[in-house]
């Protein structure tokens, strides 16, 4: 159930679902698994807010276990495409594709709450049963290219070398807020809401 907010206006009462009300304040919630429908909703909100006023920051709150690489990269590409700065605030967790999205916020404006977690790892892929050997080779090559793309983004976002990111992402690598800050994925740990 989505909560409803009721506001008093000069014309009387007006009710909004909570996400529409947050959007008025340029806040987008990226929560749950990253998949095409969720990504399309986030992208539409980013484009709408940028068209509305590209001089004002957009606040992207992230709490996701990750998910689809293509859906996540569509969000990242849109964040980079629009003119407005996107501040990212990690609450709960940013794992897997979520780390790529959260670390792609505007430099100097990437935040994390004190008890949130980050997790990087190599992308997962697979082929269904009955797959031909040639298709398996194609899938394996695509997975290696995808891993290289994601590690390049993570290296650029953190300031770490590709080699370090590659080694650190070999297996699930969980980081506390302080470890995430030291790694370079975020710029500040927020104890309270001090966003401008």
Curated annotation (Swiss-Prot):
Quote the EC number: 3.4.21.92
User: Mainly localized where?
Assistant: cytoplasm
Residues annotated as catalytic: 96 (nucleophile), 121
- Listed GO cellular component terms? cytoplasm; endopeptidase Clp complex
Q: Which Pfam families match?
A: CLP_protease
Q: Where in the cell is it found?
A: Cytoplasm
List keywords of the entry alphabetically: Cytoplasm, Hydrolase, Protease, Serine protease
Output one GO MF annotation: ATP-dependent peptidase activity
- Which one GO biological process term can you cite for this protein? protein quality control for misfolded or incompletely synthesized proteins
Reactions catalysed according to its record:
Hydrolysis of proteins to small peptides in the presence of ATP and magnesium. alpha-casein is the usual test substrate. In the absence of ATP, only oligopeptides shorter than five residues are hydrolyzed (such as succinyl-Leu-Tyr-|-NHMec, and Leu-Tyr-Leu-|-Tyr-Trp, in which cleavage of the -Tyr-|-Leu- and -Tyr-|-Trp bonds also occurs)
Instruction: Outline what the protein does.
Output: Cleaves peptides in various proteins in a process that requires ATP hydrolysis. Has a chymotrypsin-like activity. Plays a major role in the degradation of misfolded proteins.
| NCBIfam families attached to this UniProt entry | PRK00277.1, PRK12553.1
Q: How does it assemble?
A: Fourteen ClpP subunits assemble into 2 heptameric rings which stack back to back to give a disk-like structure with a central cavity, resembling the structure of eukaryotic proteasomes.
State the family named in the UniProt similarity comment for this chain: Belongs to the peptidase S14 family.
Under what name is this protein listed? ATP-dependent Clp protease proteolytic subunit
- Organism (species): Streptococcus pneumoniae (strain P1031)
């Amino acid at each position: 159930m989505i909560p409803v907010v009721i506001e008093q206006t000069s014309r009387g009462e007006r009710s909004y679902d909570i996400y529409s009300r947050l959007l008025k304040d340029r806040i987008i919630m990226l929560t749950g698994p990253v998949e095409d429908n969720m990504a399309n909703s986030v992208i539409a909100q980013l484009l709408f807010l940028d068209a509305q006023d590209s001089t004002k920051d957009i606040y992207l709150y992230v709490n996701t276990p990750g998910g689809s690489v293509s859906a996540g990269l569509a969000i990242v590409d849109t964040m980079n495409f629009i003119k407005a700065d996107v501040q990212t605030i990690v609450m709960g967790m940013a794992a897997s594709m979520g780390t790529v999205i959260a670390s792609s916020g505007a430099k100097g404006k990437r935040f994390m709450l004190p008890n949130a977690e980050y997790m990087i790892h190599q992308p997962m892929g697979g082929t269904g049963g009955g797959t031909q050997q040639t298709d398996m080779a194609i899938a394996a090559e695509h997975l290696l290219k995808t891993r290289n793309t994601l590690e390049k983004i993570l290296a650029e976002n953190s300031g770490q070398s590709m080699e370090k990111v590659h080694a650190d992402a070999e297996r699930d690598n969980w980081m506390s807020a302080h470890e995430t800050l030291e790694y370079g994925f975020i710029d500040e740990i927020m104890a309270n809401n001090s966003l401008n």
